[in-house]
Amino acid sequence: MTHPDQKPWILGLTGGIGSGKSAAAQCFTNLGIDTVDADHASRWVVEPGRPALEQIAAHFGKGLLQASGELDRGALRKLIFENPEQRRWLEALLHPLINQEIVSHLAKAKSPYAILVSPLLIESGQYRMVQRLLVIDTPAHLQIERTMLRDSSSQEQVEAILKVQIQREDRLRHADDVLVNDRDHAWLNSEVERLHHFYLTLRGGQS
């Protein structure tokens, strides 16, 4: 963890697929809090012209590139999902680069605290960048329903993703704060506002 007197201090925000991480992060953004999304950073590091994209194409073949020169993220996701060894190779390449992007963007934050949004906050070790950790928790049946609706995925596809994500109990064990997102957006917004006012009272993310 970084020094507790760092300004702004960093809140980690995570949760499983379909938990409402992005919706919660948007609520914080609407309150004037700077956020950095690890998913966005993972896209930046594989943009055309970046060294990581060249290494991926050399390793997996240029069939993973679209006609525009951009990475076919869907094809890559399918390939590594079916091959753990290749997934580990990709993670070893990308995680350090993604973390560099995250640190660079967090350093530009001007709000009283900033947020790192990441679905793999715990698994990737990114939790070491934050002073406090908020988990967006949602019952599994709602995760499945929301993801099927959002991504037009089958129940089997969503359940397969849930199986490879960190177990809910492990995620909750790392949490300083838990927001159970099992109601409507108005309720989510009110809970984020409550947490926001609490976070404004903290120094370095600590009471």
From Swiss-Prot:
Pfam families: CoaE
Nucleotide-binding recorded as keyword: yes
Enzyme class: transferase
Domain DPCK per the UniProt entry, residue ranges: 10-207
Disulfide bridges in this chain: none
UniProt key word Transport: no
Record-listed E.C. numbers: 2.7.1.24
GO cellular component: cytoplasm
Compartments reported by the entry: Cytoplasm
Gene Ontology MF term list: ATP binding; dephospho-CoA kinase activity
Listed pathway(s): Cofactor biosynthesis; coenzyme A biosynthesis; CoA from (R)-pantothenate: step 5/5
Catalytic reaction annotation: 3'-dephospho-CoA + ATP = ADP + CoA + H(+)
Keywords attached to this entry: ATP-binding, Coenzyme A biosynthesis, Cytoplasm, Kinase, Nucleotide-binding, Transferase
PROSITE patterns cross-referenced by the UniProt entry: DPCK
Annotated NCBIfam families: dephospho-CoA kinase (TIGR00152)
Entry function: Catalyzes the phosphorylation of the 3'-hydroxyl group of dephosphocoenzyme A to form coenzyme A.
Family statement drawn from the similarity comment of this UniProt entry: Belongs to the CoaE family.
Protein name: Dephospho-CoA kinase
Organism name: Pseudomonas savastanoi pv. phaseolicola (strain 1448A / Race 6) (Pseudomonas syringae pv. phaseolicola (strain 1448A / Race 6))
Name of the gene this protein is made from: coaE
